[in-house]
Amino acid sequence: MEMEKEFEQIDKAGNWAAIYQDIRHEASDFPCRIAKLPKNKNRNRYRDVSPFDHSRIKLHQEDNDYINASLIKMEEAQRSYILTQGPLPNTCGHFWEMVWEQKSRGVVMLNRIMEKGSLKCAQYWPQKEEKEMVFDDTNLKLTLISEDVKSYYTVRQLELENLATQEAREILHFHYTTWPDFGVPESPASFLNFLFKVRESGSLSPEHGPIVVHCSAGIGRSGTFCLADTCLLLMDKRKDPSSVDIKKVLLEMRRFRMGLIQTADQLRFSYLAVIEGAKFIMGDSSVQDQWKELSHEDLEPPPEHVPPPPRPPKRTLEPHNGKCKELFSNHQWVSEESCEDEDILAREESRAPSIAVHSMSSMSQDTEVRKRMVGGGLQSAQASVPTEEELSPTEEEQKAHRPVHWKPFLVNVCMATALATGAYLCYRVCFH
């Protein structure tokens, strides 16, 4: 298959970073004026991830129709997705209002609430203890009906009720719970098993509204999920499955939402998932059983997230231009946070072993510039705090820089002695 050959060539050359950069440079750029309005600032999780004006989802609210969500409409594949950010505490009601208004049957969540000690998403559905949630701002009630917990994903059956009309609908919530904090799943088997579970539920069928897909920013993992699904669908529809070009499909999707696929590793994983998924498209139905077996979905799920230790007390830096920067602020959401922080960390922590070191050189300059530009996140705040080594100089350095208090006194004594001796000599010469 052409795609498999292309994958092997790129892998062998260690060229994923360069190809990813090419896609970034070719991607569409459209205005995001509505997202940048002051009144919408607190509805954005990241300051640099905004929906394009032409493809944004509009709520049916009279006062403000904005939500950070985009409609991705793939004409040839006849598939539509709504890609959105993880809801904020103040946008959970808007999220479910969008699900209701767009007549969506399924929600795909690809992140955990807490990752690496940071809050990535609000708890926008009821847990077992509470059973239901009421969103007063949008007049909706959400009830947890059932929960099927597997080793790496959970499927929840929810009931969404419009309290104004008393109408209720079933919503399926597919939660992928073990996607690595930074990077990609170890193999495409578990991912494809999850994707086909979503497909088999009917949540992606055209008789329902677009499926809602989100991670934290709604571009990286969400883009990976939608790209793999669309490419497999196109391979199934076309007479020549090998004619599907993953890069072209991704560029088409980026016309509707910025930044889809955030790292070279995610691009590489998308290729792997499509190549493996193509075996099923080509008629090998046994692979689906293999995916299920390899994914070990019937094992015990990993333990719940253990909260991180408390952060140090808040400290402030010296005033700068009339403002103080707060260190270690533990906000639930900060609109000034930049998604670029995640991107930089992802590049540094989750590079695939197959990517050669020299291939990363094309990214190094860009990464350094962006590191200097990122100013709002915890990473930059921590960078401004001296390290332990900086605060604890060596003994020799301490001796060298220790103030010697007796030196000025000694100098004064010497000068006084010299003056007194000179005066005495003058007296003796002149008067004796």
Curated annotation (Swiss-Prot):
Modified residues (Cysteine persulfide): C215
Tissue-by-tissue expression: Found in several tissues including central nervous system, liver and kidney. A high level of expression was found in the hippocampus.
EC number assigned by the record: 3.1.3.48
Annotated positions of the Phosphotyrosine modification: Y20, Y66
GO cellular component: cytoplasm; cytoplasmic side of endoplasmic reticulum membrane; cytosol; early endosome; endoplasmic reticulum; endosome lumen; glutamatergic synapse; mitochondrial crista
Annotated localization: Endoplasmic reticulum membrane
Stretches the record annotates as Disordered: 297-322, 350-402
Chain positions with Phosphothreonine modification: T367
Uppermost EC category: hydrolase
Protein name from the UniProt record: Tyrosine-protein phosphatase non-receptor type 1
Taxonomic source organism: Rattus norvegicus
Gene name for this UniProt entry: Ptpn1
